[in-house]
């Protein structure tokens, strides 16, 4: 019995040593990367790469299936695209420049060779842990608006931050559309999910959450701006901005209330539904539509 136990012990030690040796050889010969390349789901490298395109680009077409998208202003008059390359096969970005139009896309999940369930499970864990590197950052040319921007983004959060977005059509199926510190002009942004927008100038644009709620805070309205939500809609403006513009608000099944930030615990004032103002010589109008409640919150004007 002792000999049998000792035999199993020796066998275990030997196989463990051999396993470590094979693992070391695999790492040295890029065997791990070869295995990761078989993953059906994207596995991203931690290093970042950048593509740059010049003034010859006037139109931008973006379609992303596997990457989260961030849009911001470039530091110069060129387009900068930053991303983490994919270790796994067939998940990298693809760019194509035709005349004055730049197209950017990635590929949908590819078919992978048959692997055991254990290896597939391991690759799934590795893929999930690398998702923090799945973002693509688009830097738009500073001070030089493009003629047209068409964007389709289907994963994660879509972020527009410190950006000047003009002549754009954006459709995103990610879980959140977040806009902050930006200028949106002559554009239409649509998502089935949540919209959060902060400290942003809106000019002649439409933003819509088809199936969820919408939160807008400290926005500036220029021209005709439309905000639409399936669920509740919250709009927070300074007193000065609220009094400066015309309103056209209606809720299909909810009510419209007006609150002040100084008394958040109050029940607010219920407004007529629809609620509309027609101030003479005022061309800036905020149109708000929702199937649920609409809350208008007024804050003290900044000095």
PLM feature spans:
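N-terminal beta-strand/beta-hairpin edge segment
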Residues: 64-91, 136, 140
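Short, solvent-exposed secondary-structure boundary motifs
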Residues: 39-44, 60-63, 79-90, 127-129, ...
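N-terminal Lys/Arg-rich, disordered targeting/topogenic segments
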Residues: 1-5
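Generic beta-strand structural signal
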Residues: 64, 95-97, 221, 251
């Amino acid at each position: 019995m002792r000999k049998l136990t000792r035999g199993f012990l020796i066998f275990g030690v030997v196989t463990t040593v051999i396993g470590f040796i094979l693992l070391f050889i695999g790492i040295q010969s890029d065997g791990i990367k070869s295995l990761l390349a078989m993953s059906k789901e994207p596995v991203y490298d931690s290093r970042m790469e950048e593509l740059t395109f010049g003034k010859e680009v006037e139109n931008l077409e973006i379609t992303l299936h596997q990457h989260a998208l961030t849009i911001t202003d470039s530091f110069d008059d060129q387009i900068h695209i930053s991303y983490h390359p994919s270790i796994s096969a067939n998940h990298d970005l693809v760019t194509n420049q035709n005349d004055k139009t730049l197209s950017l896309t990635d590929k949908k999940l590819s078919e992978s060779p048959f692997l055991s369930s254990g290896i597939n499970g391991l690759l799934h864990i590795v893929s999930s842990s690398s998702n923090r590197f799945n973002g693509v950052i688009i830097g738009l040319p500073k001070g030089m608006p493009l003629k047209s921007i068409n964007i389709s983004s289907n994963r994660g959060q879509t972020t527009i931050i410190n950006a000047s977005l003009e002549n754009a059509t954006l459709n995103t199926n990610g879980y959140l559309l977040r806009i902050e510190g930006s200028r949106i002009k002559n554009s239409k942004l649509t998502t089935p999910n949540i919209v959060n927008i902060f400290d942003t100038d809106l000019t002649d644009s439409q933003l819509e959450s088809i199936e969820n709620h919408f939160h807008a805070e400290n926005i500036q309205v220029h021209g005709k701006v439309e905000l639409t939500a399936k669920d509740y809609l919250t709009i927070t403006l300074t007193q000065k901005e609220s009094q400066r513009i015309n309103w056209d608000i209606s809720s299909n099944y909810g009510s419209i209330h007006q609150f002040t930030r100084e008394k958040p615990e109050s029940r607010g004032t219920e407004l007529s539904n629809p609620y509309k103002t027609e101030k003479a010589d005022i061309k800036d109008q905020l149109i708000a539509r929702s199937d649920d409640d609409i809350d208008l919150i007024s804050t003290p004007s900044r000095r």
